[in-house]
Amino acid sequence: VTLSPYVSARTKTLDYRYRQAFRRGAIAFEGAHTRDDLIPGEDRGYLFGEGRFELRDGFRLDFEIKTTSDDAYLVDYGLPDYDRLRSEVALERIKRDTAFRTSFIYFKTLRESEQQDEIPSRIFDLNYEKRFFPGGLGGEMRLGFVAHSHTRTSDADITGRDVARATVDAEWLRSWILASGLRADVQLGASMDTFDIRDDSAYPDQITRSTPRAALTLRYPMTRHEQSGATQFLEPIAQIGWTHVSD
């Protein structure tokens, strides 16, 4: 813990910093508490913090906090001049064949041109992907799920729009290397999206769409070695793809 008091005729400020390491993680906070004549009779200050923890079963928890007592404090005291404050907590696990991450983010605007209740201040994300290798079909299969939402505190039409989305995706990938050295990559997939929209009369409350896709890519990698020891690489690529969005 580090405490640094500062006293003058116009302000009384206590700066503080706290850091601690644990067996599975670490945290760090810094901030200040102020009483000054810019806003008489009011407590002012800021708090920034971050941390990371390695949890059981390969999970990792990260967090970041940024908050101030008022929009002008950082500028008044020569601190980093953020136009938006971002706080986040996230949980993730990355393994060889699976990837998972979920997070919640909160934004606080410091811009004079923005109203706090009209920005998407609360944001939730969830991502999950799994891959496996089917024996009979060959290649690689990927299955994914994505969820997202952002909300505004305003209930006004259009400017207070809130959106939630969920996506399910499946994809098959396979490659062949022919005797000539030509490589062929095939990609087949499809996704399904559903949207929930509130406080916006320009859109329906529910939208669902599907998006199949296919692609064939041909590559012909070539190398040439120079007498100087340099190696040149050339890889012509041709691709044809197709997709269709249906509501």
Segments from the language model and where they lie:
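Outer-membrane beta-barrel proteins and related beta-barrel translocases across Gram-negative bacteria
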Residues: 1-247
